[in-house]
Amino acid sequence: MVLADTNVIIDYWKMPDDRMTEIFNNEDIAVCGIVEAELIHGARSEKEIESIKEAISCFEMLSYSCNWEKLGRMLNKLRSSGISLPFTDAMIAQIAVDFNVELLTRDNHFKLIQSVFPELKLYPIE
């Protein structure tokens, strides 16, 4: 199973390249609530929200109860290492680590997280 980040889902929907098509066709793709929320946040209408919900229904939803202390410690360690990033990216990384799945993303923030937390596994896109 591979946890897909918001950016790769949007890229796949808007401009799928051969590599993304291969990944989405051959891997068990999962999303989490944060990714769902980010996708819905970007919608321009109720109709688009419904389309998003229908499109992501084919992915496995990773249900997650956040360990807030663990997340806080992750963010603290990242900040102490000079790394500042969006809160949502840290949460997505924590979910990937806790579920022991690779994260499919094109966002370089996750490489920074991985430099401090090598247990975060990134799916090779290129």
Q: Where does each model-flagged region fall?
A:
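Short, conserved catalytic or interaction motifs in soluble domains
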Residues: M15, M61, S115
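A general structural signal for well-ordered alpha-helical segments in protein cores
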Residues: E36, I49-I52, W68-G72
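Acidic, PIN/NYN-like endoribonuclease modules and their adjacent C-terminal/linker elements
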Residues: N100-E126
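Active-site neighborhoods of divalent-metal-dependent phosphate/nucleic-acid chemistry enzymes
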Residues: M61-R106
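Histidine- and aromatic-rich ligand-binding microenvironments
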Residues: D5-N7, V31-C32, S84-P86, D107, ...
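Amphipathic alpha-helical recognition patches that constitute DNA-binding helices
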Residues: R19, M91, H109
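Short, well-structured N-terminal submotif of metal-dependent ribonuclease cores
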Residues: M1-V31, I40-K53
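Phosphate- and divalent-cation-binding pockets in alpha/beta enzyme and binding domains
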Residues: E38-L39, K70, L112-I113
